[in-house]
């Protein structure tokens, strides 16, 4: 059964990633709830999930702010991912069911055949397959939890790539994911970590280019619940 906050999470998430790309904004929870016609309780759940995904933070006075997604933060997030994600995926490789890996591999093969004719959420689902679903099998829950705040990188791609940012001429990451999944199916933890590091190294450069491009467009925000805020001194 879908929970109440899930009904409005995606559109709120889309607007919050745009806030993050534009800078630091104060997010008024009451006005946001009114804007979407839901209760404060429902909207608070939405914002708590956005916080877990690294989109917003709450200050000592319980005020919500977007976390700017600029080149510096992209580099910080990828530094964290490059340290932790290869380890987490290599650990997951030892326990994830073979059937799960075969299904992920099958979806990648289908996507390669169809690219660029994919549904709007097609790329996002493939990203989630590896970086969330497969990674969730890591037996170290602290690694999984630490990586949650880096999901704003995936959220950026989810809401902009193939929509406001044109899809690249060549497939964006399918072969890289296939090499990681193949190593996982062989239960070769060292190869999983090696392929994951290579993938993240390439992904960092692509995301940096896309973030620079999006921020350079300077599209003004017109959201009744978001007000540009100065950085704390």
What are these regions (language model features)?
Residues 29, 140-141, 187-188:
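Short loop-to-helix capping motifs
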Residues 1-84, 226-233:
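Short linear motifs at protein or domain termini
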Residues 98-162, 176-177, 194-202:
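Conserved amphipathic alpha-helical segments that form helical-bundle/coiled-coil interaction surfaces
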Residues 160-233:
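C-terminal all-alpha effector/ligand-binding and dimerization domain
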Residues 3, 121, 125, 168-172:
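Short helix-capping and inter-helix turn/linker motifs at the boundaries of alpha-helical repeat units
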Residues 15, 19, 114, 135-137, ...:
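Hydrophobic side-chain positions on well-ordered alpha-helices
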